[in-house]
Amino acid sequence: MPTINQLVRQGREVETTKSKSPAMQNSPQRRGVCTRVYTTTPKKPNSALRKVAKVRLTNGFEVISYIGGEGHNLQEHSVVLVRGGRVKDLPGVRYHIVRGSLDLQGVKDRKQARSKYGAKKPKAK
């Protein structure tokens, strides 16, 4: 433990926090082009085929992003909007693709949590 005198001379070093989504470079979202769209399996104990895409962002970064929701229309060369946010059971996936924006359509027939999946309000009968 330092003495008061040592603290007066030196001071405490502030710990800098490392970004959890460095490819965003302090932007809320980034545009990118899909270079590969594929499925991958999660870590134990989960089991599924999770839909992910490798995206080249406008700032040159190449990231793996998760495609949320049921069904999607993404292909290679699709232009997408990428936001931060990791997927806990997929190692290396630290970004999400925004549904209902640019080339990615919203989830069809979605009734709840629509804003998260880019779904329009259903017509009232």
From Swiss-Prot:
With S4 and S5 plays an important role in translational accuracy. Interacts with and stabilizes bases of the 16S rRNA that are involved in tRNA selection in the A site and with the mRNA backbone. Located at the interface of the 30S and 50S subunits, it traverses the body of the 30S subunit contacting proteins on the other side and probably holding the rRNA structure together. The combined cluster of proteins S8, S12 and S17 appears to hold together the shoulder and platform of the 30S subunit. Transmembrane segments: none annotated. Gene3D superfamilies: Nucleic acid-binding proteins. CDD domains: Ribosomal_S12 (cd03368). GO terms for biological process: translation. InterPro entries: NA-bd_OB-fold (IPR012340), Ribosomal_uS12 (IPR006032), Ribosomal_uS12_bac (IPR005679). Residues 19-29 have a biased composition (Polar residues). Residues 1-31 are annotated as: Disordered. Part of the 30S ribosomal subunit. Contacts proteins S8 and S17. May interact with IF1 in the 30S initiation complex. The keyword Cell membrane does not apply. This is Small ribosomal subunit protein uS12. GO terms for cellular component: small ribosomal subunit. SUPFAM superfamilies: Nucleic acid-binding proteins (SSF50249). The modification 3-methylthioaspartic acid is found at D89. Belongs to the universal ribosomal protein uS12 family. NCBIfam families: rpsL_bact. One of its GO terms (molecular function) is structural constituent of ribosome. Keywords: Methylation, Ribonucleoprotein, Ribosomal protein, RNA-binding, rRNA-binding, tRNA-binding. The gene is rpsL.
